[in-house]
A protein has these predicted regions:
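Catalytic core of nucleotide-sugar-dependent glycosyltransferases
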Residues: 78-87, 93-120, 139, 146-168
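Amphipathic alpha-helical repeat scaffolds of TPR domains
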Residues: 128-143
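Membrane-interface aromatic/basic loop that binds lipid-linked glycans or pyrophosphate carriers
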Residues: 146-208
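Donor-binding/catalytic cores of nucleotide-activated saccharide
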Residues: 1-74, 84-98
């Protein structure tokens, strides 16, 4: 059964070369992952992409880092990749992700560290990069809330403190959304509400 098909035709012109100025902003919840992208090798080299070894969830970095160097794009509305979700041992399974939360946190922090605030990005690209950072941070916080232990809340507070210290301006941008505020909440009611939103979103979008 097909749970989710990722399409970008509402934002990207199809079957033609275009720039970010020709694109429309992707709405929240619509993000690109590794299976959606094919990069030119020269662009990958220029970006200096280095993925941490023996770490899951680095596909976020594969998308995020080189994308900042992209100028022209070509979108094909074709299913290049299909991914089965539902096995208990999958890296995106909720329980597995919580058990590997340190790796998710590491990737989250590397995303912030690799965001080039000093560069002038086209508006659509900048919005996407900020949204990608936001959704990754929300996922990290939501999983830590689901973990439910004191150590999970300590890790969440440490993550948010590290992100804020790394880039205060961007942190402010990714923490002003209502869902972000709930996921990042330090109080118990906020964490309970975060768990409820996570469950509803999980059923609606069909992830893990």
């Amino acid at each position: 059964k097909t749970k989710k098909i990722m399409r970008y035709s509402s934002a990207f012109p199809e079957n033609q070369v275009f720039t970010w100025d020709d694109a429309k902003s992707l709405r929240r919840g619509k993000y690109m992952m590794m299976h959606s992208l094919i990069y030119n090798m020269n662009l990958l080299r220029k970006s200096g992409l280095q993925l941490p070894e023996h770490t899951f969830y680095v596909d976020n970095l594969f998308v995020f880092v080189p994308l900042q160097y992209s100028k022209s794009l070509y979108y094909m509305n074709v299913d290049f990749y299909r991914y089965f979700i539902g096995r208990e041992d999958q890296s995106v399974n909720e329980k597995v992700m919580i058990s590997r939360i340190d790796q998710q946190i590491r990737v989250n922090e590397l995303l912030m560290a690799n965001y080039h605030s000093d560069r002038q990005f086209p508006t659509v690209l900048k919005n996407y990069l900020i949204n990608h950072l936001e959704i990754t941070t929300v996922i990290s916080c939501a999983l830590l809330n689901k973990g439910g232990q004191v150590e999970h809340q300590e890790k969440k507070e440490a993550l948010l403190a590290d992100l804020k210290e790394a880039n205060p301006e961007v942190f402010q941008l990714i923490s002003k959304n209502v869902v972000s505020k709930i996921a990042m909440s330090k109080n118990k009611p906020g964490q309970v509400l975060s768990n409820g939103i996570y469950t509803v979103t999980q059923r609606f979008f069909g992830f893990n």
